[in-house]
Amino acid sequence: MKIRNSLKSAKVRDKNCRVVRRHGRVYVINKKNPRMKARQG
């Protein structure tokens, strides 16, 4: 999982990427390609 300041570039890497909020943190997850994960902060 990458930790990034901005998730905009992480979101557009793949069309299956979704932005979700968990426990006050923002994550990018991808069910089809689980390697495409990122967290903001």
Swiss-Prot record:
Belongs to the bacterial ribosomal protein bL36 family. GO terms for biological process: translation. SUPFAM superfamilies: Ribosomal protein L36. PANTHER family: 50S RIBOSOMAL PROTEIN L36 2, LARGE RIBOSOMAL SUBUNIT PROTEIN BL36B. The gene is rpmJ. GO terms for cellular component: ribonucleoprotein complex; ribosome. Keywords: Ribonucleoprotein, Ribosomal protein. Coiled coil: none annotated. It comes from the Bacteria. This is Large ribosomal subunit protein bL36. InterPro entries: Ribosomal_bL36 (IPR000473), Ribosomal_bL36_sp (IPR035977), Ribosomal_L36_bact (IPR047621). GO terms for molecular function: structural constituent of ribosome.
